[in-house]
Regions:
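Oxyanion/phosphate-interacting regions
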Residues: 1-60, 64, 83-84, 244-247, ...
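N-terminal subdomain of lithium-sensitive/metallo-dependent phosphomonoesterases centered on the IMPase/IPPase/PAP
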Residues: 2-162, 242, 337
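Acidic beta-strand-loop-alpha-helix segment within the catalytic core
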Residues: 28-30, 179-264, 270, 314-339
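Residue-level signal for inorganic ion chemistry
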Residues: 62, 66, 95, 106, ...
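DPxDG-like acidic metal-binding loop motif
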Residues: 140-208
Length: 339
């Protein structure tokens, strides 16, 4: 009988190599899982990458609630009163259900982080422990660079459970978004905007780290370009008059709803500037400001003040209007400064 010792040695060596590789992979996976869950329960420190994953998932969950309410034709519409422009400010079950889904998901996932929402609800169901790992894994397709750990006390999360509620009630669904913004030491650095009806797309950007792939097809600037201003439907007339003074007839004004929608229009190059001439709430603009800044644009008040006061103790209202651009920001500021 002949024994092929060389073949056995080769087989055993191959088996040993496979075993070692599998053990290494198992070890790396266990470290990752341990790191992930330790960050999830660590109230003192938080991973910005995990926060991005959580914001992404929260925006999607809110969108599912918004769509569910829309599909129920019997939902009720209440009113918060009127805006300064005299426009009714409605609120619906979609606002509240989206708030519950988004707020409790983020609060449970990141217990040491302050979460500020536009809405409050008295009847939110208790939330279970969120599983962010699958969402975090989906971000592997994006080059977000290195992770960053920050003090949880330095982080404020701003959420808008349903932007453009009035248009939601009017079935103008293209304007509707759910939004999450992550501010560190008062500065918006991560923004997530989800469109629950318009192709169900989710847009995000993280300053100095990366952005969602749906921002990769932004057209390059073509000169010369006339100013294309996107403005709120509720006070388009005022901006129209001011714009005529600032630019004469060499301007195009596009009325739209939802601060999130308008910020995305600027980021996509469909508008050269987003102008808002009255006070605006921070949950309306935080995500859009973070995205535009991360993509290389600029967002300030109409008096040029930067977006740096998004901490837990700051006012929820931005005064002195809003200007968002991808380029020529100072030129637009100068045009509107004295109007």
């Amino acid at each position: 009988m002949t024994i092929n010792i060389g073949a056995n040695v080769r087989i055993n060596r191959l088996g040993l190599i496979i075993t070692v590789v599998l053990l290494i992979l198992l070890y790396l996976y266990s470290i990752r899982e341990s790191s992930y869950y330790s960050q999830l329960i660590n109230k003192d420190e938080v991973s910005l990458r995990n926060l991005l994953a959580g914001a992404y998932r929260a925006a999607e969950l809110g969108g599912l609630e918004v769509v569910a309410v829309h599909d129920n034709p019997r939902y009720t519409i209440e009113s918060k009163g009127k805006t300064k422009e005299g426009v009714n400010d409605p609120v619906t079950a979609a606002d509240y259900q989206s708030h519950c889904a988004m707020y409790h998901f983020l609060s449970v996932a990141f217990p040491g982080v302050v979460v500020i929402s536009e809405e409050r609800s008295r009847s939110c169901e208790p939330a279970g422990t969120p599983d962010l790992q699958n969402v975090a894994d989906s971000l592997e397709n994006y080059d977000t660079g290195y992770d960053v750990l920050v003090k949880a006390s330095d982080v404020t999360v701003w959420i808008d459970p349903l932007d453009a509620t009035k248009e939601f009630t009017e079935n103008l669904l293209d304007y509707v978004t759910t939004m999450v913004c992550i501010a560190v030491k008062g500065i918006p650095i991560i923004g997530v905007i989800h469109k629950p009806f318009d192709s169900k797309l989710t847009y995000w950007a993280w300053a100095d780290h990366g952005a969602s792939k749906n921002f990769q097809n932004i057209p390059a600037s073509k000169e010369p370009k006339i100013p294309i201003l996107t403005v709120s439907r509720s006070h388009a007339g005022r901006v129209h008059n001011a714009s005529k003074v600032a630019f004469g007839d060499n301007v195009k004004i596009v009325s739209a709803a939802g601060a999130g929608y308008k910020c995305l229009e600027v980021a996509a190059g469909n508008a050269t500037a987003y102008i808002h001439m009255t006070n605006i709430k921070k949950w309306d603009v935080c995500a859009g400001a973070a995205i535009i800044n991360a993509l290389g644009g600029t967002v300030t008040s109409l008096s040029g003040e930067p977006m740096i006061d998004f901490g837990p103790g700051d006012s929820t209202v931005l005064e002195h209007g809003l200007l968002a651009t991808m380029e020529d920001h100072k030129w637009y500021l100068d045009k509107f400064y004295n109007l």
